[in-house]
Amino acid sequence: MSLAGGRAPRKTAGNRLSGLLEKEEEDEFYQTTYGGFTEESGDDEYQGDQSDTEDEVDSDFDIDEGDEPSSDGEAEEPRRKRRVVTKAYKEPLKSLRPRKVSTPAGSSQKTREEKALLPLELQDDGTDSRKSMRQSTAEHTRQTFLRVQERQGQSRRRKGPHCERPLTQEELLREAKITEELNLRSLETYERLEADKKKQVHKKRKCPGPIITYHSVTVPLVGEPGPKEENVDVEGLDPAPMASALAARAGTGPVIPPARCSRTFITFSDDATFEEWFPQGRTPKIPVREVCPVTHRPALYRDPVTDIPYATARAFKIIREAYKKYITAHGLPPTASALGPGPPPPEPLPGSGPRALRQKIVIK
């Protein structure tokens, strides 16, 4: 518990408060804002000898919408007595409201003309409306208005009547020559700037040394070339059904779009780099692809007697029948004596195997 709350109050507490309030200076805010909050002196009681022009109010604002206008003025006195005196503020010694002074008709007309020239903020309509404009703001507005008026007057004097005479042909040619020189200088400057800009463009840097380029594309698929067809004349084999079947298959089949495949190309800039990555060795022999002379298919077997490759059993039978007909017509070949009794065969040449002794029979 604090000491101030526990001790007894002083007997002299508040004696100097009234003196401080009397010495307190009046604040300018309460005198200027909204026309002032202080009451006028001598307004406590109604004074009948005062002129009616001081409190004269327009009839449109004095009469309510629901009330009828009264001609005897009975409601004037109670309305004035209804004001409440504010005790929080000290009444000033003199009234802040300037009293109207009667002026002649000539001066009033001159005043109206001056008000028409002033802005709306500085015009005083003569009514009892209290404005909230400070003195400094009013002075600043007045000076601004005077500066605007002076600027407008100077512009009017400068804009006086001015007529330009038409130029002669000699003057036009002289002006065109000056313009041409200016354009040429501007063009030279522009070309020089463009040349400097081109010099500053970075050139494409080339990589020194060997380069390996990798490029992958899609190309149409090209079939491998097939073996050359051999005409085989075999009795008992009718080629008409095969030809008709192939023609029917080619005519009725759907149109297939060409197939595509992927191809990858690796390019070397020089031969040394290529040989470094792919050293040259012994070239392997590519095996010869043998084809059956009857079916024109890759041969999977070989006839041990005639040494002719074949693909199916039917082709083997056709080859043997052709071999029998050849023997019947021409007899056994010279090398066929090795199969039966007779003189021994000649010695094989060096480097030749058993297959070198066989003679390939060509079937026509």
UniProtKB/Swiss-Prot annotation:
GO terms under cellular component: NuA4 histone acetyltransferase complex; nuclear speck; nucleosome; nucleus; protein-containing complex
Modifications made to the protein after synthesis: Phosphorylation is enhanced by ZNHIT1 and promotes the interaction of VPS72 with histone H2AZ1.
Acidic residues bias locations: 40-75
Subcellular location: Nucleus
Gene Ontology molecular function terms on file: DNA binding; histone binding; histone chaperone activity
Ranges of Pro residues composition bias in the record: 341-351
GO biological process annotation, one example: transcription initiation-coupled chromatin remodeling
Cross-link (Glycyl lysine isopeptide (Lys-Gly) (interchain with G-Cter in SUMO2)): 115
Positions of modified residues (Phosphoserine): 129
DNA-binding region as annotated in the record: 156-206
Main localization (coarse): nucleus
InterPro entries listed in its UniProt record: Vps72/YL1_C (IPR013272), YL1_N (IPR046757)
Keyword terms of this UniProt record: Chromatin regulator, DNA-binding, Isopeptide bond, Nucleus, Phosphoprotein, Transcription, Transcription regulation, Ubl conjugation
Biased composition range(s): Basic and acidic residues: 127-142
Disordered: annotated segments: 1-164, 335-357
UniProt feature coiled coil, ranges: none
Assembly behavior: Component of the NuA4 histone acetyltransferase complex which contains the catalytic subunit KAT5/TIP60 and the subunits EP400, TRRAP/PAF400, BRD8/SMAP, EPC1, DMAP1/DNMAP1, RUVBL1/TIP49, RUVBL2, ING3, actin, ACTL6A/BAF53A, MORF4L1/MRG15, MORF4L2/MRGX, MRGBP, YEATS4/GAS41 and VPS72/YL1. Component of a NuA4-related complex which contains EP400, TRRAP/PAF400, SRCAP, BRD8/SMAP, EPC1, DMAP1/DNMAP1, RUVBL1/TIP49, RUVBL2, actin, ACTL6A/BAF53A, VPS72 and YEATS4/GAS41. Also part of a multiprotein complex which contains SRCAP and which binds to H2AZ1/H2AZ.
Biological role stated in the UniProt entry: Deposition-and-exchange histone chaperone specific for H2AZ1, specifically chaperones H2AZ1 and deposits it into nucleosomes. As component of the SRCAP complex, mediates the ATP-dependent exchange of histone H2AZ1/H2B dimers for nucleosomal H2A/H2B, leading to transcriptional regulation of selected genes by chromatin remodeling.
Similarity comment text for this entry: Belongs to the VPS72/YL1 family.
Protein name: Vacuolar protein sorting-associated protein 72 homolog
